[in-house]
């Protein structure tokens, strides 16, 4: 849901890592914004309301992580003077300061202006759907809204703090349309939603399973709270659908169709069974390797590789989540139950696995036994607290993944530690 300035390849890589590690991704238009030569006539009140046309533009999801949720913008056109501006609330610039602010949960976005033809070229080239919806407002209201957009795009007014769910490139146009639509849009969207914020994130990220699981892991129980359709409009597609139903806009007009892109799932995916199989297989392999490590000369090295891989794959996200809770303002990561399943302690399995690659000793095995026993205990606690009425986090799939890993590895190392023929110290 954002547009960005051109950046060097290395900066793009660093930026992607920052986005990947964040609680939630934000969409991207992958376009730079060039200053327009002249202020539009409506910025000075020179356009007549009868000559103005205001539309919502909805861009469908893209194929990369940063554009999975789609994008929204507002279009103002003076049909007599043949002047147009696309107003995009998704502008930001990649630099080191931005990455630091993003990591701390304080990302500054701004409202930018762009030429319509250039905007259409960029999104069309990406193969994304583009839909126009002309707002059915009076000439006086169109003039007032156009003037407001020009005023909002001034350097002193354009900035805001981005929030993926509460304040983004779709919620800002939603609020503007509702303001000049005399509250009709909010009234239309006041009914309860049948899904949670987590459900929607799962739907939109299903096409990227690794990203989907990471985002699901990083979100806490705040995304389970009851919401209305108004809250769902952090998604551009929801805003477009509800605007059409409100009577505030003409029927949607598709100006570019999506190219070879699967439709967004209507229901959130069900991962519990698949993740349980992955977790059971991972833990089962570890248990089997601990059994072989008793007598097979090369088995401890394989066990060390297993611990290195599991420690990194599970431990790094656990460390990121712990840091987000302790040191940042990513409130959707606070008090996350998933830290009972995976946390910085998991990462300690990686260096201990490296030790096993070169030396089998009781001290290393004792540390791994204590590590996985602790994680097995906290995982069982995470399962048992589900009976409590104030525990609402929907992390069943992650429980299904992590619980068998932690329990089976704890069992394997406990049995291995009891082997009387292991070398010391």
Segments the model singles out, each with a brief description of its role:
Residues 2-16:
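Bacterial N-terminal signal peptides that target proteins for export
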Residues 15-25:
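Bacterial N-terminal signal peptides
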Residues 29-33:
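Boundary at the C-terminal end of the N-terminal hydrophobic targeting segment
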Residues 34-54:
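A eukaryotic "domain-start" boundary segment
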Residues 50-128:
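Glycine-rich catalytic cores of cysteine/serine-nucleophile enzymes that process amide/ester linkages
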Residues 62-63, 127-136, 155-164:
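Second-shell loop/turn segments in exported
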Residues 137-150:
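A structural motif
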Residues 151-425:
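Activation targets extended, charge/polar-rich intrinsically disordered C-terminal tails
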């Amino acid at each position: 849901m954002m547009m960005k300035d051109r950046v060097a390849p290395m900066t793009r890589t660093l930026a992607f890592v920052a986005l990947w590690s964040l609680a939630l991704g934000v969409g991207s238009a992958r376009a730079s914004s060039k200053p327009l030569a002249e202020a539009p006539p409506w910025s000075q009140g020179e356009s007549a309301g009868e000559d103005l046309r205001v539309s919502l533009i909805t861009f469908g999801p893209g194929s990369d992580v940063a554009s999975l949720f789609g994008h929204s913008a507002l279009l103002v056109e003076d049909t007599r003077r043949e002047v147009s501006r696309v107003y995009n609330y998704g502008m930001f610039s990649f630099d080191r300061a931005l990455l630091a602010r993003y990591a701390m949960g304080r990302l500054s976005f701004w409202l930018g202006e762009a030429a319509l033809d250039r905007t259409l070229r960029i999104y069309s080239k990406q193969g994304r759907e583009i839909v126009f919806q002309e707002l059915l407002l009076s000439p006086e209201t169109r003039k007032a809204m156009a003037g407001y957009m020009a005023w909002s795009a001034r350097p002193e007014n354009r900035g805001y703090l981005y929030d993926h769910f509460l304040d983004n490139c779709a919620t800002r146009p939603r609020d503007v349309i509702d303001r000049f639509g005399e509250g009709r849009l909010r009234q239309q969207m006041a009914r309860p939603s049948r899904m949670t914020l987590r459900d929607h994130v799962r739907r939109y990220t299903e096409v990227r399973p690794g990203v989907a699981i990471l985002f699901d892991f990083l979100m806490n129980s705040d995304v389970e709270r009851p919401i209305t359709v108004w809250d769902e409009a952090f998604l551009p597609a929801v805003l477009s659908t509800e605007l059409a139903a409100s009577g505030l806009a003409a029927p949607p007009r598709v100006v570019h169709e999506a190219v070879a892109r699967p439709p967004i799932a209507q229901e959130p995916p069900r991962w519990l069974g698949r993740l349980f199989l992955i977790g059971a297989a991972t833990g089962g392999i570890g248990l089997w390797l601990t059994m072989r490590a008793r007598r097979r000369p090369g088995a401890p090295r394989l066990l060390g590789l297993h611990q290195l891989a599991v420690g990194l794959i599970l431990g790094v996200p656990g460390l990121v989540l712990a840091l987000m809770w302790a040191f940042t303002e990513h409130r959707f990561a606070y008090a996350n139950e998933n830290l009972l399943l995976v946390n910085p302690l998991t990462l300690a399995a990686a260096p201990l696995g490296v030790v096993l690659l070169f030396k089998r000793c009781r001290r290393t095995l004792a540390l791994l036994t204590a590590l996985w026993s602790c994680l097995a205990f906290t995982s069982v606690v995470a399962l048992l607290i589900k009976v409590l009425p104030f525990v609402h986090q929907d992390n069943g799939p992650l429980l299904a993944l992590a619980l068998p890993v932690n329990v089976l590895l704890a069992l394997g190392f406990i049995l291995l530690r009891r082997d009387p023929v292991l070398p010391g110290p």
